[in-house]
């Protein structure tokens, strides 16, 4: 038992964090100030797409930022006309400031809440030097008036539809201040992302895939509940996904769908298509996917080695307040066992600071995670994103503490909790990460299959206890070379495991019938 007051008995030592992980690269480090506004040569038909820098949380693993690339900007790049040269730049790969010699004619910048300030800094820097700047992303949708002064045009909605239109208008000097598109188009018509633009060695895998768009839930705290964001559930043909997986020639893929399991009939079909590849993958699903244990078996046979599940809370009252459709929390443990019985690891996501959370929530959550041997856990302080139901509720109650968007990163308390102080919420958040990333907790959650323990420990220590080294792996392009041997070993074990699984009876949910793949 963990004492309810343990998180508050002593202060958690602050983890060391390299300056490169908290501070964006200087934009004018090599130029005298007098030259900052001098005219620059602007190359026609040259576009740069930028994912801005954001400060990393010292409590969490830095590795989560480079597991797989985001797809939005390289998906837009795939729609760029052939006579345009396009470049992709992710500031979080620690390669310095974005390209500026020659100055691109067009700069597209994605804007999210926690790096809006950096996005505006980049936008202003490029505009004064002659580039046309297009801002898009969720923050543009939720706070367009805040973004407009920093852009030549705003892209509100599906950028895959908007990007070619914007470039055409730039060519004809008819650029409009705003462009809008819905997410209701047939998703299967989108071209595959342009992965050739990626710095491949800086990611665990470059094969981030999207098979579906949207989610059957609309939780009040989720960014999908943002005003104006209507994202009907859309699915790509399974064979399209298979061809994209094969084309990138990687052994491991991460599905970055909001919820791959919203349509179980579709997921059954997708698993049937993926199974012949003999590759491995992970995905985000909701825990109710275990309503159909035969689907869990098919996922394992298709190569699923891990799932990211938003448990959010162990309180039914909190989940009801959030309008999340989910099974009773008392049934979570049984459902986790079903996943484990089929060799599927669980990364549980938990939100801390709901209105029914008291100061014992940290100890109770940590204890439950250890009892149920979740291989990994991710934590977030409840954060009211602008233009969501949660933000409106807290604003009406006078509980919003400030609007420093940089701190709306789910690692800081930006509102007044009901049953603790903001400082206690932040201390509990730091404690639970400290607890779950400790040697003792990692060992408590080891697989029951002793043969899987060495690989589990190697991955756990690299991911959870190597923050001192992650910035070096990222900066020097060593993420993929270091991870790939572990991924290959995981794939080898899982291929052997699912051969045994395929030969077994299809009886579902009997603990011990299936040996954990340990991946």
For the regions a language model picked out, list residue spans one by one:
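Structural detector of well-ordered beta-strand residues that form the stable sheet scaffold
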Residues: 134, 155, 178-179, 282-284, ...
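Flexible glycine/acidic-rich beta-alpha junction loops that bind and position SAM and/or redox cofactors
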Residues: 54-58, 143-146, 265, 317-322, ...
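Alpha-helical structural signal in soluble globular domains
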Residues: 79, 83, 125, 129, ...
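Radical SAM enzyme core and accessory elements
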Residues: 1-49, 85-88, 100, 169, ...
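Short, hinge-like loop/turn segments at secondary-structure boundaries
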Residues: 66, 104-105, 150-154, 172-174, ...
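Acidic, low-complexity intrinsically disordered segments
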Residues: 25-248, 252
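Structural recognition of alpha->loop->beta junctions
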Residues: 146-165, 298-308, 364-379
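Radical SAM [4Fe-4S] cluster-binding motif and immediate context
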Residues: 191-347, 352-354, 358-367
């Amino acid at each position: 038992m963990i004492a309810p007051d343990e998180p508050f008995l002593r202060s958690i030592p602050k983890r060391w964090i390299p300056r490169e992980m908290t501070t964006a690269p200087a934009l004018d480090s090599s130029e005298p100030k007098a030259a900052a506004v001098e005219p620059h040569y602007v190359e026609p038909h040259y576009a740069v797409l930028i994912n801005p820098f954001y400060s990393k949380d010292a409590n969490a693993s830095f590795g989560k930022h480079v597991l797989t690339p985001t797809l939005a900007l390289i998906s837009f790049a795939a729609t760029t006309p052939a006579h345009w040269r396009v470049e992709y730049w992710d500031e979080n790969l620690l390669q310095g400031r974005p390209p500026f010699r020659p100055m691109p004619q067009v700069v597209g910048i994605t804007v999210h809440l926690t790096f809006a300030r950096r996005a505006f800094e980049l936008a202003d820097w490029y505009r004064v030097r002659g580039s046309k700047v297009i801002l898009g992303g969720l923050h543009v949708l939720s706070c367009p008036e805040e973004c407009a002064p920093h852009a030549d045009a705003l892209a509100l909605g599906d950028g895959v539809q908007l990007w070619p239109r914007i470039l055409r208008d730039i060519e004809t000097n008819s650029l409009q201040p705003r462009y809008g598109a819905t997410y209701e188009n047939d998703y299967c018509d989108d071209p595959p992302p342009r992965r050739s633009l990626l710095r491949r060695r800086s990611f665990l895998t470059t094969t981030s895939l999207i098979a579906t768009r949207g989610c059957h839930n609309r939780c009040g705290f989720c960014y999908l509940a943002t005003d104006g964001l209507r994202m009907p559930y859309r699915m790509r043909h399974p064979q399209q996904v298979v061809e994209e997986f094969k084309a990138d020639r990687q052994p491991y893929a991460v599905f970055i769908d909001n919820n791959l399991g919203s349509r179980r009939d579709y997921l059954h079909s997708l698993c049937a298509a993926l199974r012949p590849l003999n590759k491995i993958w992970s995905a985000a699903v909701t825990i109710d996917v275990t309503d159909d244990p035969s689907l869990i078996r098919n996922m394992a046979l298709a190569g699923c080695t891990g799932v990211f599940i938003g448990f959010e809370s162990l309180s039914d009252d909190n989940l009801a307040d959030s309008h999340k459709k989910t099974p009773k929390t008392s049934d979570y443990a049984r459902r986790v066992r079903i996943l484990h019985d089929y060799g599927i690891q669980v990364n549980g996501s938990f939100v801390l600071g709901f209105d029914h959370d008291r100061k014992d929530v940290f100890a109770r959550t940590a204890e439950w995670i250890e009892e149920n041997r979740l291989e990994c856990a991710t934590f977030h302080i409840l954060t009211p994103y602008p233009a969501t139901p949660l933000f409106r509720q807290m604003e009406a109650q006078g509980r919003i503490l400030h609007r420093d968007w940089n701190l709306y990163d789910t690692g800081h308390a930006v509102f007044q909790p009901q049953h603790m102080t903001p400082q206690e919420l932040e201390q509990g958040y730091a404690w639970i990460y400290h607890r779950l990333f400790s040697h003792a907790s990692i060992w408590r959650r080891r697989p029951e299959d002793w043969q899987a323990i060495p690989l589990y420990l190697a991955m756990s220590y690299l991911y959870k206890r190597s923050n001192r080294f992650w910035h070096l792996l990222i900066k020097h392009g060593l993420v993929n070379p270091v991870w790939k041997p572990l991924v290959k070993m995981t794939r080898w074990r899982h291929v052997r495991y699912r051969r045994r699984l395929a030969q077994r009876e299809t009886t579902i949910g009997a603990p011990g019938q299936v040996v954990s793949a340990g991946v």
